[in-house]
């Protein structure tokens, strides 16, 4: 199905030249002279590169053949990550470039969304909020009470986030995976 210029918006998935993209930013421009156009930044699902593209009135792009499947992350083995389709129990292996930044939030057994393009896995999305255990952080010192102060904490997946001083090693915290920010302690 063709997508017209007027339908473009942030987050929309499009296909150009057989490559699936996600619109990460767009701006509708109405110059004083000439026809209106849309200037967009689009990110490739295949290699993660962001390019700037201009769409003019009448331009059309295709809707990509993308399917999102819920899969369970099993384990990391060298340079591959093993996943299992929770419906068919079929297992697939993805490499570092396919998993990308999601790897620093994934725990064995976690359910993730795997994006397929023409039945080939191209990316992995983790939940927006995950609960992870702190394995290393600086100890608290008397007087560390300023609410604005933060310290680095290493999580069980290896990711490092900034946490308030009152958070201790061994505690489980919730983290926003998009902003990589501490949200709260898990009680």
Curated annotation (Swiss-Prot):
TM helices/strands, residue ranges: none
Organism lineage: Bacteria, Pseudomonadati, Campylobacterota, Epsilonproteobacteria, Campylobacterales
Cross-referenced SMART domains: EFP, Elong-fact-P_C
Keywords, ordered alphabetically: Cytoplasm, Elongation factor, Protein biosynthesis
PANTHER family: ELONGATION FACTOR P, ELONGATION FACTOR P (EF-P) FAMILY PROTEIN
Molecular-function GO term, any one: translation elongation factor activity
Protein name: Elongation factor P
Function: Involved in peptide bond synthesis. Stimulates efficient translation and peptide-bond synthesis on native or reconstituted 70S ribosomes in vitro. Probably functions indirectly by altering the affinity of the ribosome for aminoacyl-tRNA, thus increasing their reactivity as acceptors for peptidyl transferase.
Pfam families documented for this protein: EFP, EFP_N, Elong-fact-P_C
GO process annotations (BP): peptide biosynthetic process
Family according to the record: Belongs to the elongation factor P family.
Location(s), subcellular: Cytoplasm
Pathway listed: Protein biosynthesis; polypeptide chain elongation
GO cellular component, one term: cytoplasm
Keyword DNA-binding (UniProt): no
CDD domains: S1_EF-P_repeat_1, S1_EF-P_repeat_2
């Amino acid at each position: 199905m063709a997508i017209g210029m007027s339908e473009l918006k942030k987050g929309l998935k499009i296909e150009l030249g057989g490559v699936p993209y996600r619109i990460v930013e767009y701006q509708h421009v109405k110059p004083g002279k000439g026809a209106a156009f849309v200037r967009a930044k689009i990110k490739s699902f295949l290699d993660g590169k962001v390019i700037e593209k201009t769409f003019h009135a009448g331009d059309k792009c295709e809707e990509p053949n993308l399917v999102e499947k819920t899969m369970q992350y099993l384990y990391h083995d060298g340079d591959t990550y093993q996943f299992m389709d929770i419906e068919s129990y079929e297992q697939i292996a993805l490499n570092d470039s396919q998993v990308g930044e999601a790897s620093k939030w994934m725990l064995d057994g976690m359910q993730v969304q795997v994006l397929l393009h023409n039945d080939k896995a191209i990316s992995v999305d983790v939940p927006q909020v995950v609960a992870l255990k702190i394995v290393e952080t600086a100890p608290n010192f008397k007087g560390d009470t300023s609410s604005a102060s933060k310290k680095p904490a290493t999580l069980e997946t290896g990711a490092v986030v900034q946490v308030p001083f009152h958070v201790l090693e061994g505690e489980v915290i919730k983290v926003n995976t998009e902003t990589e920010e501490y949200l709260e302690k898990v009680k």
